[in-house]
């Protein structure tokens, strides 16, 4: 069994959440693989910047964890943190992302493609009283 770990952030700003549309067609939170020597939080901040051009900070270490098997003999763990926008202008990373959008938190659950991410969004809405 191969194990993979990715980290990302759920960035909420003024009642909207930052989502990316991957080139494969699915909508999700920005995330990516942890690079050698990087902490989980550093990975989340870097991936949001790379995929969306948005700068964020992560102050709380609240984690939302999703585990699934994307293919046979592979188990993937994705760790999301809550990010706060501190700068940058939306711009998709064309190698991986076809669109970047700030979506009203109440509509985000509908827009997100995968059920596991929908559940995380619902939990964030509850936890943050959005």
Question: Which residues does each predicted region cover?
Answer:
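N-terminal strand-loop-strand
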Residues: 1-29
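C-terminal alpha-helix
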Residues: 123-130
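Small-residue-enriched segments and motifs
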Residues: 7, 56-59
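Unchanged
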Residues: 34-57, 64-123
């Amino acid at each position: 069994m191969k194990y993979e770990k990715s980290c990302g952030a759920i960035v909420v700003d003024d009642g909207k959440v930052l989502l990316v549309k991957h080139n494969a067609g699915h909508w999700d939170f920005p995330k990516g693989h942890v690079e050698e020597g990087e902490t989980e939080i550093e990975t989340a901040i870097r991936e949001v910047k790379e995929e969306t051009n948005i700068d964020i900070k992560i102050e709380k270490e609240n984690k939302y964890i999703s585990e699934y098997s994307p293919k046979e003999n592979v188990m993937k763990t994705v760790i999301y943190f809550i990010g706060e926008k501190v700068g940058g202008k939306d711009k998709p990373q064309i190698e991986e992302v076809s669109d970047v959008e700030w979506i009203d938190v109440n509509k985000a659950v509908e827009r997100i493609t995968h059920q596991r991410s929908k559940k995380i969004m619902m939990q964030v809405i509850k936890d943050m009283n959005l």
